[in-house]
Structures are given as structure tokens and as C-alpha cells.
A protein has these predicted regions:
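Compact, glycine-rich, soluble single-domain proteins
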Residues: 2-134
């Protein structure tokens, strides 16, 4: 039996990131359960520009992700409880190497690799969304 990709609806509220260049708007799918966190973008084709997956984790703590069964390279953007970005890491396709946040994070945004640089997103920038409660 072939594994199936998890496709979630795009949240009606965009995620905004305030950067030095201004606000960036992304349409996101939101994962907020352990089952959804475990599946993430596994078996999915590459995300288009302007799209992402927002992981709402249970606690603000050091987060560790991996790219198992994820065929597309990603930028992983880790943010604290207040939405401030604490680190940005790159994930390589299908790798089981651990990708840790540098500091405690409550939110993780996955976008296509290169999107963070293209959009000017850097540590210290702030993510805003109805689910991010500072």
C-alpha cells in the first residue's frame, strides 16, 4: 500500500511575517495534533511560493524535526511563543538527520527551501496569525 500525503485545508487567515522589507503574507495549512505533526509534508510535491505549513506545538521548548519521507527540500522557520523567529534551518529531502531549533520554539513554519531568503525572513522577525498568542 502506497503512503498517502496529508492535505489540510488552507487556513482562512494568512500568516504574516514582519521583515525588514515589510510584511510578507503566506497561505498556510495548520497542523495542531500529534498525528498531523508526525505526517507534515511527507509524500507531498513541492510547495508553491507563498504557501507553507504551520506547526502549532504543544509547548514552547527545543523542537527537533526531520525530513523522513519528505521529497522536497524545505526551510524550517522556528518561532517562540510570541511569534519571534529564533532560527531558520534547511531540511534536505528524505533525510532522517535531526533538525533542531537553536532556542525554545512553539511554532514551526515549513516553506519551500529558499523561500526564507527570497522573502527576506530572518531571525528576530515576527510571525503573526490568530493562533499565535504572544
Amino acid at each position: 500500500v502506497a503512503e498517502q500525503a496529508m492535505i489540510l485545508p488552507v487556513d482562512p487567515d494568512p500568516l504574516l511575517i514582519t521583515t525588514s522589507k515589510g510584511d510578507v503574507r503566506l497561505d498556510v495549512e495548520v497542523t495542531d495534533t500529534q498525528v498531523e505533526h508526525a505526517r507534515g509534508l511527507m509524500f507531498r510535491p513541492p510547495l508553491p511560493q507563498g504557501r507553507g505549513m504551520l506547526f502549532v506545538m504543544g509547548e514552547e521548548e527545543l523542537q527537533v524535526f526531520w525530513m523522513r519521507n519528505t521529497p522536497s527540500p524545505l526551510d524550517l522557520i522556528f518561532a517562540a511563543k510570541d511569534g519571534s523567529i529564533v532560527s531558520i534551518k534547511q531540511g534536505e529531502p528524505l533525510s532522517e538527520a535531526q533538525i533542531p531549533s537553536d532556542k525554545p520554539a512553539k511554532y514551526v513554519l515549513e516553506v519551500a527551501q529558499g523561500e526564507a531568503a527570497r522573502l527576506g525572513i530572518q531571525p528576530g522577525d515576527r510571525m503573526r496569525h490568530r493562533l499565535i498568542q504572544p
